[in-house]
């Protein structure tokens, strides 16, 4: 199946999920789209993951998402970094917050030309989303060491 077809079918899954139908399949295709280098596929995958996944989803999918998001948060491309942080802010699961907190804190506190203002704003919004959803995570030493 071509990447165009995968992207098209994932958009159909997103649409059916938004309409309220049970779409508990196709998450692995969305994760494979996140791994693509083409921006269209990556955007589609991140939107699908952000909308369709929650705490009750398959843990194996979260492991794949964490690895891909770690790569995107440290790649240096501001669009990919912003996509990853937007999705993290929307999902906000405790496991994702614990795993990716150091990278997000680093991005929010970095004040060099290597980290544009847009990326720092996304990082701060992601941290705010984590704070609103799980206040108990901010008591852990990982967060305190970052600040």
What are these regions (language model features)?
Residues 2, 6, 37-38, 76-77, ...:
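Short inter-helical turns and helix N-cap capping residues of alpha-solenoid HEAT/ARM repeat scaffolds
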Residues 23-33, 58-73, 96-111, 137-147:
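HEAT/HEAT-like alpha-solenoid repeats
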Residues 56-57, 78, 92-95, 134:
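Short helix-coil transition sites and intra-membrane helix breaks within transmembrane domains
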Residues 112-125, 136-137:
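A conserved hydrophobic secondary-structure block that centers on an alpha-helix together
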